[in-house]
Amino acid sequence: MTHINKGKPFPLGSSLTSQGVNFSLVATNAEYVEILLFEKEGSISPKSILKLDQNHNTGPYWHAEVKNLNEGCFYAFRVKQKNNGINNNYEKKVLLDPCSRGITGWGSYKRENALETHENTNSCLKSVVCDRELFNFRDYPRPKHSWEETIIYCIIFLFYSKSIYTTFI
């Protein structure tokens, strides 16, 4: 049986603790969040599903510390949204941790399954718990470019590719 504590909302993603791994995810409109733990990279179904109730919710953050987990474990999330009048049927979707430092499952990943509403545990990407302290930031310094001289482009592809000459079928 897996033991979980309340955990902390920060840092986001997964982080090693003295007792296991802390998970934190932003899910503003969630009714609950599930952490799916996979035995190995190629697992098509989770070995454990940990449902986080409101005790693991602080504002928009959902968090839990799972005891006895180590670096290298494979995980993902599922989010059940509150009933907001929109029938999206995505609570079965396996979601990659947006703050993950390691991603696996590219060999079995199928984008078309990610876009459908049915369950996609057999073809999803999985996050990998990595030790944050091992990355040497000194070897990869920030670019020596001032923010005043930085140009950030934002493009909305729907409107960028939409034209009067485009034919939609």
Describe each PLM feature range.
Residues M1-S18, N57-Y61, N68-I152, S163-F168:
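The feature marks proteins involved in alpha-glucan
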Residues Q19-F23:
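Structural beta-strand segments of beta-rich domains
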Residues L25, F77, I155:
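Conserved, mostly hydrophobic/aromatic
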Residues V26-Y32, L69:
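Short proline/glycine-enriched turn/loop motifs at strand-loop junctions of beta-rich domains
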Residues E34-L36, A76:
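Beta-strand signatures of extracellular beta-sandwich domains
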Residues P46-H56:
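Solvent-exposed serine/threonine-rich low-complexity stretches and specific carbohydrate-binding patches
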Residues S48, P60-H63:
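Short S/T/G- and acidic-enriched coil/turn segments that sit immediately N-terminal to beta-strands
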